[in-house]
UniProtKB/Swiss-Prot annotation:
InterPro entries: Cit_transptr-like_dom, Diverse_Ion_Transporter. GO terms for cellular component: endoplasmic reticulum membrane; endosome membrane; lysosomal membrane; melanosome membrane. This is P protein. Most abundant in melanocytes. Also present in neonatal and adult eye tissue presumably as a result of expression in the retinal pigmented epithelium and choroid body, known sites of melanogenesis in the eye. Small but detectable amounts also observed in fetal, neonatal and adult brain. Moderate amounts detected in adult testis and ovary. Not detected in heart, kidney, spleen, liver or thymus. It is a multi-pass membrane protein. The chain crosses the membrane at residues 173-193, 326-346, 349-369, 382-402, 418-438, 502-522, 618-638, 640-660, 676-696, 719-739, 760-780, 811-831. Its main location: membrane.
Amino acid sequence: MRLENKDIRLASAVLEVELHQTSALSVPTCPDPGRLLTVKPATSNYKLGQADPCIPYAGEAAGKSVCVPEHTEFGSFLVKGSSSLKDLSFKEDTPLLWNSSQKKRSQLMPVHHPEFIATEGSWENGLTAWEQKCMLGKEVADLSALASSEKRDLAGSVHLRAQVSKLGCCVRWIKITGLFVFVVLCSILFSLYPDQGKFWQLLAVSPLENYSVNLSGHADSMILQLDLAGALMAGGPSGSGKEEHVVVVVTQTDAAGNRRRRPQQLTYNWTVLLNPRSEHVVVSRTFEIVSREAVSISIQASLQQTRLVPLLLAHQFLGASVEAQVASAVAILAGVYTLIIFEIVHRTLAAMLGALAALAALAVVGDRPSLTHVVEWIDFETLALLFGMMILVAVFSETGFFDYCAVKAYQLSRGRVWAMIFMLCLMAAILSAFLDNVTTMLLFTPVTIRLCEVLNLDPRQVLIAEVIFTNIGGAATAIGDPPNVIIVSNQELRKMGLDFAGFTAHMFLGICLVLLVSFPLLRLLYWNKKLYNKEPSEIVELKHEIHVWRLTAQRISPASREETAVRGLLLEKVLALEHLLAQRLHTFHRQISQEDKNWETNIQELQRKHRISDRSLLVKCLTVLGFVISMFFLNSFVPGIHLDLGWIAILGAIWLLILADIHDFEIILHRVEWATLLFFAALFVLMEALTHLHLVEYVGEQTALLIKMVPEDQRFAAAIVLIVWVSALASSLIDNIPFTATMIPVLLNLSQDPEISLPALPLMYALALGACLGGNGTLIGASTNVVCAGIAEKHGYGFSFMEFFRLGFPVMLMSCTIGMCYLLIAHIVVGWN
């Protein structure tokens, strides 16, 4: 701000007051700040930068006393390096119209002093100047008040941030304390109850000779669990009763009570089919204990020929009812989902906590498993498949093939983003119909991430879309998804005429209809979502680079001086990149349209930047990967290949490691998603423990009861609707593999019940459709979802439970609705049974 005297005679004295952002420098005023006069006589000998003395005078023209500062006290405050500037001690909260008399006693001089006498015209000009100065003083005062208000707001904001930080620390402390207490409590409960173990007893039964035993010592028990092992089949007998089977009769005497004068004898019959292939199968059944009387068990075989049938029998008394065990299982499952949904802990740790809680619950009810038994619950075939394919993909990424595929996909889409997403989703759905879903996403995820980085897209949204269509496509064939494999492999269903071709024919048509509806629905769900990043690609890549550098620094454990030095260098690199990012954010601003108009020019630039880096390694990788995929496909048709998917993936990884001649093996191991593998191991233990707590069995039995309650003329349609939706909702919450394995015998018993007489195959199609499509409901509903999320997180693009849920759950609802309508038309209207 510049204050000048308009009088020509006083033009020689110019006083400049610069208002800076950090300090406010103002001229001193009289006790009456209503009028301000800053003048300097031309005849004065004052140096430039000094002010006149000021003496009080009752100005007649002005009506009030006006003053100017005396130079001896105010000093040369504009001279650079002057000590007067230090004496003034201006601060950020110093008012612009600062009274110098508050700091020092200033002498005042009347304005009617001879040296200040001027002509009438100049005096009028002075009055005008005074009015302007008064207006200026008021504005400056307003600015000072505004600055003070902003500082108060800033202080309030700082105080609010401090309160939020303190609250965050309290919440974090409560979380850690609560989880630690929970873990300690579960550990104590698990350690208090010993491992009872199962004592198997060998016995032989025949049509002419049965086996009987009396059990006692169950004073505090509520449930009797019987385990039968041998050449058995998990399923009830058909209505004809011609199959060979074993009948287990459990009898107990209920003592006389208040309502009964005589004791009552309770009898339970359990029929188990014999397997002609003599496979070793373990089946279990629970029976309620109604009294403290001894329990009698009798086993007899019903055979077409007289022969002995060897069996193994084990029994165990449990201290909690089935309802109590189911309630505890539901509470544990709800707790695990709460930890994952709200991201209280990492999903791997959440699965481990859930597994520990389930094991503690089993220990309390008297069914604590041994460590060997718990390890047997882990599906090592799935883990071997994941590990082998991760090794293959890690070596494959060294060739630059993923970058090349990304550029080709961009070229085929001609710069249209949604055309490219449509092609990626369609390719993923088709490939997953003939390969395992996990294998499909292990191959597609790196390509998609690199493609999105090239096009400045958000990879999270595209990856979620691919996962959804991978799960949909996997339901089309008998080998696309594990539930389908379990259903087709069942021997009882094979006897009913279920084969690969028939199953695929039924499922393929329904999945095609689901795909046709799911694509428009996905586009509708993405309608208001910005697929492009809001910032330029340079900024996005720089942020991602900072994130990767920081993760790398955090993963280095400072065990030695050299590692500490390397970690320090990485952190310095992070600081340098953050400084560069701040400069880029200040410089670059651009808007990106939803369709790239200059795609042809971009293609040429991308082709120059992203090429195949190692052609010889690419040939080796393609050869091994082609062999592995071929073996995956032939494994389901050629009986001479005695290798499962896990062995094929492991052998392929070993082959490629030999051909690639990689000396630094730790680099490849660093690219393996160990957190994902550990999550699956914990999830397998959790789901198997929940199965032992009778959760899955309870859901199946309640579904069967609901179907029996429906009138007979509507029972078939109601069964299809119930099975589809129960399977879909259950598979979105728990693993669909144990659920499918448990529901198959339940549905077989339901179809073979003479009172219901429902066809079994349509029920199996409904089970397969619901179990496969239900995996899109939540992030942990299918193995494919977890694998994709783990790889994306490894690349710095992880997505949360809710991000997947907002897109996956609506697609799951719509796809299950379309699939249900297809099954109703095919089996109710058309009668394709």
